[in-house]
Amino acid sequence: MPAHIEEELPPPSPQPSNPEDGELYSQYKVVRTLGHGTYAKVLLAKHWLTGTPVAVKVLLKNKPCFQPAMKEANIMKKIKHPNIVSLLQVFETKTRGYLIMELVEGQELYEYIKSSGHIEEDEARQIFLQILSAVSYCHGLGIVHRDLKPDNIMIDDKGSIKIIDFGLSTQVKPGDLLDEHCGAYAFGAPELFLWKSYDGTKSDLWALGVILYYMVVGKVPFDSYIIPELQRQILAGVYPAPCGVSNELKDLLSLLMTVNPKYRPTVTEVMKHPWLRGHCKGLTNIHEEPVPVRPDPDIVDAMQYIGFQAKDIRESLTKEKFNEMSAAYYLLEEQALQREVRSTQAPTVSQVKAPFPSMDAGEASCLKIKRSGSASILGRSVWPPSIDQEPAYVQKVRQRAGRRSSGHGLLFEANQMTPTQDQHHIRAMSVPCMLSTSSISEESVSEKREENLSHIALAEDKPIRSRGWCRGIMRWTRRVGNAIRTLCCCIPSRKTPQLGQSRVSPQK
């Protein structure tokens, strides 16, 4: 990176090095840099209230990339789909713009296929269906991506995908043609090389055909380092037929990579193709109008408890402000959804009977936020590591909640299963557990436990054990409790086995 860029966008630190970063650091803890370009930088950060990791794109407003990035943000504000990366928050200062994005786990589809050689037809179908669902959703909103390629598709170890990078996307009305020619050459449709107006939805469908071919073969159908030669191949529309695949798949590939866009199918027609027929249940209905936002009352109550106003929360959501309140709401909503999914997958754990008096001081809930007159939803957390690192914003939140504890206050307890930095890709952190803790203090719990232990010793006509013995019991209690909590809330995901390394050689 050039030296002057490093000066303008300094490396992350626990405290803001620029006064304009105050708003960012008041809501997020900046961890480290994920990547950088000439005029922008992407940071890994954690949301102070929930502990959820996010990606922060920092842009310089006086640079050429700023306006395209804001255009991308305006398009992403209209999108909410499980197979598309989510935009959480947007704000600007005098010289910078900040895009808070969902942190996507996994690796690029390009790297996934490259490491495997190719993937089998059934797996390719499952991945392609997710891509098709996202593209059909966008086309239903009048949004064309224009840069669909394996590099812009992320896949995790469960086979779930998310489309990223809407930097070249645009919104059109039905029947509108585009004049701007952009995207990767190898995935560009023939009409892009003719330098004429084109239908953006049809060019997206061509790119889908190239992606599908790449998945089952392991290489792109049109390949040349010489641009004129690559252009000649694409305009001719002739490519090596894939080996070892069904006739239905071959037919779908030929339809998607039809040179004349007038005869190229739409997303709706692709879904009806025999290769996909019977597998499209559950895909997003592209003709369905967006459902009006109805905030979850449990989440609204929790946010009210820490000082937000219900009216402001609803206004932020309905008017799509993408501000601090809407970001907090969406992060809590995603945690609740993940918790529900994991609870359905987790096996039933029988209760463990301890040989010592049990504590009645609160029960952890993994599904819903419970609130009562004496309950506090600010639970203890293992992150952040020190109360001194909390910004004034978080401390004010705790004061509004009426909590004067020396412990760290997050809305949910963060999971300790943190990925190491030497992994090949950044995984999205495990969602924290939702807690409903009692207002009984730790001192009163400790006093009751010692009192109960004293009664047991007197009943057996034995002297009371030393404090060291009591502390050992307390440590044992905490270990058992942590083990039970881990079983209930932290079921790790299973990794899919590695695919074979054999490659399919295209027919000449």
From Swiss-Prot:
Binding site for ATP: L34, G35, H36, G37, T38, Y39, A40, K41, V42, K57
Stated role: May play a role in sperm motility, especially in the regulation of flagellar function.
InterPro entries: Kinase-like_dom_sf, Prot_kinase_dom, Protein_kinase_ATP_BS, Ser/Thr_kinase_AS, UBA
Catalytic activity field: L-seryl-[protein] + ATP = O-phospho-L-seryl-[protein] + ADP + H(+); L-threonyl-[protein] + ATP = O-phospho-L-threonyl-[protein] + ADP + H(+)
Alphabetical keyword list: ATP-binding, Kinase, Nucleotide-binding, Serine/threonine-protein kinase, Transferase
Chain positions covered by the region annotation Disordered: 1-22
EC top class named in words: transferase
Record family assignment: Belongs to the protein kinase superfamily. CAMK Ser/Thr protein kinase family. Smok subfamily.
SUPFAM superfamilies associated with the record: Protein kinase-like (PK-like)
Chain segments annotated as coiled-coil in the UniProt record: none
Pfam families on file: Pkinase, UBA_SIK3
Lineage of source species: Eukaryota, Metazoa, Chordata, Craniata, Vertebrata
Other facts noted in the record for this chain: Encoded on the T-complex, a region of 20-30 Mb on proximal third of mouse chromosome 17. Naturally occurring variant forms of the T-complex, known as complete t-haplotypes, are found in wild mouse populations. The t-haplotypes contain at least four nonoverlapping inversions that suppress recombination with the wild-type chromosome, and lock into strong linkage disequilibrium loci affecting normal transmission of the chromosome, male gametogenesis and embryonic development.
Species name: Mus musculus (Mouse)
GO molecular function annotation: ATP binding; protein serine kinase activity; protein serine/threonine kinase activity
Positions annotated as active site in the UniProt record: D147
Protein known as: Sperm motility kinase Y
Enzyme Commission number, as recorded: 2.7.11.1
Domain Protein kinase: 28-276
Top-level taxon: Eukaryota
Residue stretches making up the UBA domain: 294-334
